[in-house]
Amino acid sequence: MYSSSNSFLNPNAARPGQQQYGQPQQQYTGFQQQQQPTGFMPQPTGFAGGQMQPMQPQPTGNFSRGPFQQSSFQAQPPQMTGYPPQNQPFQPQQQQSQTMQQQSTPAPSLPARLPGQTSSQIANSFQTISSPTTGVNPHHAPSKIPTQRLSFITAQDQAKFEQLFKSAVGDSQSMDGETARDLLLRSKLPGSELSKIWVLSDTTKSGHLLFPEFALAMYLCNLRLTGRELPPSLPDRVKNEVSSMVDIISFAVPDDNPPVAPKTNVPNFDQPLMQNTSAPPAPQQPQPQQPSNSQLLSQLTAQPTGFYNQATGFQPPSIVAPQPTGFPGQNASLRPQATGLQPNPQATGYTGPRPPMPPMPAGFGSSLSPSQTGAPPLAAQPTGIPGQWGFVNAPATGLPNIEALKQRLMPQPSREGGYTTAGLAGNATIPWAVTKDEKKIYDQLFRAWDGLNKGFIGGDVAIEIMGQSGLDRQDLERIWTLSDPHNRGRLNMDEFAVAMHLIYRKLNGYPIPNRLPPELIPPSTRNLDDSIGAVKSMLSQDAEQRKVSGAFFQPQKTGVSYLKTHSFRTGSASPGLGRKDATVFKNNDDDVVAYKSSARRRAGGTPSPSPSSTPAEKVDNDLSVEQLKKKIRETQIMLDATDFRDENRAEEDEVLNRRDRKEAESLMERIRRVQDDIDTDLKAAFRNADSGAERRALRRQLQAFQDQLPELASNVRKLERSIADSKLELFRLKDAKLHPGAAMEIIGTGPGGAVTEADRIKARARARMQARAAELAGRPAPQADDGSAARRLEEEKATVAAERERHDAMTRDVEESVKEFSQSLEDSLRDQDENSTRDHERRRWEEALGVEDQIRDLIFDLQRNRRTAKVRKEEERAMRADNSSYLQPQARNRSPVNDDGRRRTSPLRSASASPSFAGLSHEERVASARERAQKRIAERMAAAGLRPSSDASESFPERQEREKREKEERRRRAEEEDAKREAERQKRLAQEKSPVTSPPPKPSSKKPPPPPSRKVRTDVTESVEAKKAEDSVVASKARAEQEEKERALKQEQEAQEAERKQLEDEAKRQEEELAREKEAAQARLRALEEQVRQGKIKKQEEKRRKQQAEKEAKEKEARLAAQRAELEAAQARERELQRQLENMGEEESSSDDEGPIEITPQTSTPTQSQVLPAPFPQPSPPTAALPVPAIQEPDQDVAREPSPTLPSPVETPEPVKQTLPPETESRNPYFRQLSQQSAPSAAQPTHEMQSTNPFHRLAQQESTSKSAFTTDATVPGPLERKSRVRPEEDDWSAAESENESDEDDDRVAGGSAKQLASILFGTMAPPRPLSAMDEKTESKAQSPVQNAVVTPPPPPPAPEADDSPEIEAEREIADMSPAAPDDAGFYTPPSIPPPPPPPMPGMEASAGAPPPPPPPPPGDAPPPPGGAPPPPPGPPPPAPPGPAPGPPGREAGRGALLADIKAGKGLRKVVTKDRSGVATAGRVL
């Protein structure tokens, strides 16, 4: 290839083993030319010898033209030949060996110069430092260093480096390796460091250093000299700056001015281009090229013979044909001749393997090279200038696999992936530039893929084309980057050719360059960039010249244009070419073929139609028939192309229209969804509040209010005046009544009856006359007026006037504030008024004025949907109102609390709506009225979507204080309401539980079925309510639909009809669902009733068994009473007590720990002696008030807990009424009931809350019974009649306590003794009453009353006992029990035999003794040691007295205890025998 503009930067950068065209060819000593053909005769140039010997350089011609350069050719040294003034030697070409070396061995007699060293060789040369050789630098144009600043060095250092660089390179643009080596060695750095510096500095790897690279090398040397380490690689900033400056220097070198090569005997093909660069040379006869190196080495036929031709101006006498030389003007007639007698034409010069030759200008005789003569035809030769496309022929070896590449890359109907380089790869010699054949193939590929004639190929298509080559993705990415320098994402025809050429080179083993060489830069891009640069330089030079010469201030008057001296071409325009440059363009109207009116430039005598025809008509007239036909065909082709282009454009427009329609449809669908969201939003009512009509209505309403304001203020002032007059009149009357005769009656004659000074004078005169008349008549003188009444009246007047003034000021303030507020409202309404443009736009999109039909349909559809959503919302609002009005009476019927709550909330609502002004001063009333007015106006504005201006009269701290006060007031009112509500609830609960005192039913009679549960009633009621609500919804929807039908248009009626049908279907479906729910609720109700009935039957059977057991118990009790009568009283009792006390330490059980701790049982714990048989009606002595658990009615229990899983009827206890302070309670009624029951046991921290799940409680009870069986727990006394009712918080069931009593009767004696001891030491009571109580408990243990349920008549309230905390707690707990003893389980049947005779006094005393408490619930902590009593529980509220009778008096016989103990021992087996029969009594299974 020809030497490019920057070929001097990298003379050996081509493929290894090849030399770039235009570079000095290096000769090697590895191949000596020994054999000479004998047919050659010595050339008559004055030298003898038939064979070539190594010769010294022998310059010929004029030596004054310049020094010659030493070449590296060993076999044939260079010789200066030719005409001396041309200063260009003939350069013979020598053969090269197959294995080419980069450096030749210098001859001993000549100093070695290494002109072709690579960057790596120069870097290695630093390792073995030796004295460098000097050489002569080639002649270059003056070096120009860009003014760009390098940031990694200072400006002073850069100036020094520039001076050093210029002094070292002279006029050259680059510094060769030897010079750089000399300079770097002066730093005295080791060779390894200098080698690293060279590798980092030579960024182009060309063996030369440009100025930025040289400055970088100096910078790195300075780093190393200062002791810092060299970086392994250059920083990105430094690298970018250096490469940018290198590019600027490289691109500044013009393509048509290559550097002068060293003067050698190699032919210089660039010389013809130096003569006239403005006109490109014509293609000339190319030189033949050898096919391959192997043929050359095997044949060795092309040998230089004799001495080289020397054009000395004369022709030597020889057998060789003369070679004409001479001046450039003679070159047209000269013909190059072969130098020798060869049987065949043989090429001379360089005959080794070489790449295809780039375009070479030839035909000028200034630098003739040896060429073949003889037999034509002539082979094609690459011609042209560097980088010019279309003049580069294919190499002699051809372009292998180019057709295969074309066939693969052509569009095919079915292609498959997975392409490889098989069949495309090779090792052909490919030049840098694109050859003619390649360009033709690449253009065909481009046109085949560019079916729409767009002029470019997109990235997706290029990926498909380039991917079929089989190259790696990384290589294709690099090729694309080089081909698309402007990053446009597409390739035109030239850029596509560059990409295909790089792919073809890569397939043949060539590396992909980092930067696109100048030969591959497309002409359009390069010429455009060069033209822009030339224009810029010309403009800058012209401006500089005019500024220096002062031409800016001297207008040009001569009319001479100097543009002819400006040209894009460096040389002057050739006169014979006739080509114009853009700088000397002149418009010629005659060349324009267009219509020209004949009326233009019409002279006076010229006829109207001009007889002369236009040049275009002349041209048409001169055309022949064939030319006209050709023109017609061309026009037809153009018309066809236009039609095809129009069709393609129409198709593209149709595609775009379809895409636009799809997008428009998607947008309209999104608009509909957004409109639906807006319509269904809760705040959609405020959406249209900002319309113009709404604002105008608000302004009219505001104006009406403003008109009413003066009248209201006048009325207020009149009222104030009348109030003031009334106050004065009232004061006069009161003062006259308090001070009779003190005031003078003064009749006012002033305006309005006002008293004037004259009236007062007259009154005083009248008073004096009356006094004188009384004195004359002897009557007592009337009381003289001392002026006190007048003073009091004046004071009152002043007070009334001041108050009136104050009220007037307040009225004015209110009036002004209302005016300001109304002004702000008016301003806000006026600011939002729409102008004509906005109104037009609003009407356009809201009323569909001036829009397309499709948009109009969309707007109407949105409006219909909006109206439908509005109607639906109104119906839902009406339905909610109907539901609320329907649910209120239902709520009143269902719960009596609702009336109270409604009565409580309605005053609050009315108070908030119209607050009472009682007890407020006038100022406070005015302020309240003002605040309410502002609040209403603010609410209206908020509903209208307006923002009124903030009230500046109230500061931020004042507003905070006011809000804080209001918040505190609301909280206080809420607390009061909660307290009232809680009190009413407690009262209602007490009314529900206490009045049930009906006589107990007979055991044989069947209980009435319990009422359905509240939950079931609620479900039924709610279902009925829902049904009615749905009916009302359907009716309201029907009415709304009817109204909508009357208003809607004809096309809207169909949509409304469909919607009505849908709503009817929905209503039917909802009615069916309600019916199904109602049936399910009825089924559940029937199931619950059946379960209740079965439970009652089981309960009756249980009652019969208990009655039978009760009979047996009474018989045993009669026998026990007879035995107690026969026992001794005092002595035996004392001995037995002593024995029990001694046995306390011997028995170890849980009763020691748990017995005494529960002296005061909890509300939820079954207690002792709460139900006594009827034969003992004596009142309770004041010893102790026994606690009684809550006894609940079975009807209420069943009604409240209708669990369908219960196998047997179980009465769950009703919560014990307890009233706690409202602030400490939860507002959940169920939670309050639990907290009320657990409040008395709050003093014991170990008590646990139990679950309300019946199955969970069953498991707890079973675990509790098991623990009671395995532990020595304290059991209640056997005489006690257990209640099967268990509170919700109770961990012990009634049945469980009975089982424990039955199963643990064998430990009753020991447990009773321990309990007696605990009671004795805990209550500090006398031992005798405690013994009597224990005796009574032990004696009653023999009775099986616990297995039967007897209901005694309601006993009288327990009398007051002593003030011990335990007794008080027991009394309070007993008081909490309800007074309803109508449980069927506690009824005493009439068949019970009469009780035995009354026992002894001791027995009477022991009858009501408090039994030991039952064991605490599981998890309770053990009692404190020593049997200390627990702290008393918190005081519960009073409740109706329980049914348990009071215990007997403390005084009892001492023998009763001994009899009780002995009887207890005998009762063990009896009770144990009967426990199986009553094991399930009262237990929840």
UniProtKB/Swiss-Prot annotation:
It is found in: Cell membrane; Endosome membrane; Cytoplasm, Cytoskeleton, Actin patch. Pfam families: DUF1720, EH, WH2. Residues 16-59, 67-107, 290-301, 1160-1170, 1235-1245 have a biased composition (Low complexity). Residues 189-224, 471-506 form the EF-hand domain. Its main location: membrane. Residues 1-119, 253-379, 596-622, 773-843, 868-1485 are annotated as: Disordered. GO terms for cellular component: actin cortical patch; endosome membrane; plasma membrane. InterPro entries: DUF1720 (IPR013182), EF-hand-dom_pair (IPR011992), EF_hand_dom (IPR002048), EH_dom (IPR000261), WH2_dom (IPR003124). Residues 1453-1470 form the WH2 domain. One of its GO terms (molecular function) is calcium ion binding. Residues 280-289, 997-1013, 1174-1184, 1390-1401, 1409-1448 have a biased composition (Pro residues). Residues 1144-1156, 1288-1306 have a biased composition (Acidic residues). Residues 788-819, 827-843, 871-880, 921-939, 956-991, 1016-1031, 1038-1139 have a biased composition (Basic and acidic residues). One of its GO terms (biological process) is endosomal transport. Residues 647-737, 1024-1150 form a coiled coil. CDD domains: EH, WH2_Pan1-like. Keywords: Actin-binding, Cell membrane, Coiled coil, Cytoplasm, Cytoskeleton, Endocytosis, Endosome, Membrane, Repeat. Residues 157-245, 438-527 form the EH domain. It is a peripheral membrane protein. Component of the PAN1 actin cytoskeleton-regulatory complex required for the internalization of endosomes during actin-coupled endocytosis. The complex links the site of endocytosis to the cell membrane-associated actin cytoskeleton. Mediates uptake of external molecules and vacuolar degradation of plasma membrane proteins. Plays a role in the proper organization of the cell membrane-associated actin cytoskeleton and promotes its destabilization. Component of the PAN1 actin cytoskeleton-regulatory complex. Belongs to the PAN1 family. This is Actin cytoskeleton-regulatory complex protein PAN1. It comes from Coccidioides immitis (strain RS). The lineage of its organism: Eukaryota, Fungi, Dikarya, Ascomycota, Pezizomycotina.
